[in-house]
Amino acid sequence: MISGVLYALLAGLMWGLIFVGPLIVPEYPAMLQSMGRYLALGLIALPIAWLGRVRLRQLARRDWLTALMLTMMGNLIYYFCLASAIQRTGAPVSTMIIGTLPVVIPVFANLLYSQRDGKLAWGKLAPALICIGIGLACVNIAELNHGLPDFDWARYTSGIVLALVSVVCWAWYALRNARWLRENPDKHPMMWATAQALVTLPVSLIGYLVACYWLNTQTPDFSLPFGPRPLVFISLMVAIAVLCSWVGALCWNVASQLLPTVILGPLIVFETLAGLLYTFLLRQQMPPLMTLSGIALLVIGVVIAVRAKPEKPLTESVSES
């Protein structure tokens, strides 16, 4: 249990970096950032895939199709929506919307996967969800009070919608990915991360070319193919690809095999906490008291959720009888 939580913590620390990436290169469209990140990931995965080609051959066609669906929803579409939301609403607000994942995932895990992983009684789960929900509200209120430069309701609202879409994408990814890993305990998490990175390569390459064509027609002054700050953009995409997409996904895959889905869900809060930490470091300011109170409630909620013990899976009970 402890090792699984530590792996989830490390994944959250890595994933938190994605909230500051769009702020470093705000002049780059979200489409270019999303495709650039996963194009870098796919290229990095090529030599690793060659070294692990024996394990990759063990995957069936349906496994590769699952990897493709996962990478489309949990990588490309998710990051495109998130980067767009961050540029429209600011990093803290988008971070807190993504922060609803610790509430969304365990609820759906309890509804969908209780027969396999064991059901966590709603009476045990409710205090954790309430703490997390109040904590998220506190941080969100604090950030809205902080204000946004050049505020535009239409742009802000569209950013909220895009952030909500990214929540749906990642919730589906987390549940479906954990389900595959739990159903395939003989498959190494690194092999599965490599497979997802590989199928990302052709999709992201096509997407990057489409983004360049669109920019060339809509914004002819935009320098192509790597924008006005090519060295910064390429370095940032490679760093995010390695730390967030590779190391983060690997750690999360290990945690997914070690922990029940209903407990794994609340641990997504580590990503939210890391994103807030990095954002305030970038701002070079201390978070306000309400934000700190919200963070404390988030941590308390996670501790309550992790300490709760799921009931025995129904499948095991049937097999034993």
Curated annotation (Swiss-Prot):
Q: Does the keyword Nuclease apply?
A: no
GO CC annotation, single? plasma membrane
* Keyword Cell membrane on entry: yes
Side Cytoplasmic, residues:
1-4, 52-65, 114-120, 176-194, 252-261, 307-321
Q: Which Pfam families does the protein's record reference?
A: EamA
Q: Localized where?
A: Cell inner membrane
The residue spans the entry assigns to the Periplasmic side of the membrane are as follows 26-30, 87-92, 142-154, 216-230, 283-285
- Name the predominant localization: membrane
**Keyword set, alphabetical order:** Cell inner membrane, Cell membrane, Membrane, Transmembrane, Transmembrane helix
Residues annotated as domain EamA: 13-141
Say which domain of life the source belongs to.
Bacteria
**Parts of the chain that traverse the membrane:** 5-25, 31-51, 66-86, 93-113, 121-141, 155-175, 195-215, 231-251, 262-282, 286-306
User: How does this chain sit within the bilayer?
Assistant: Multi-pass membrane protein
PANTHER family the record matches: INNER MEMBRANE PROTEIN YTFF, OS03G0707200 PROTEIN-RELATED
- Give the protein name, as stated in the record: Inner membrane protein YtfF
Q: Which organism does this sequence originate in?
A: Escherichia coli (strain K12)
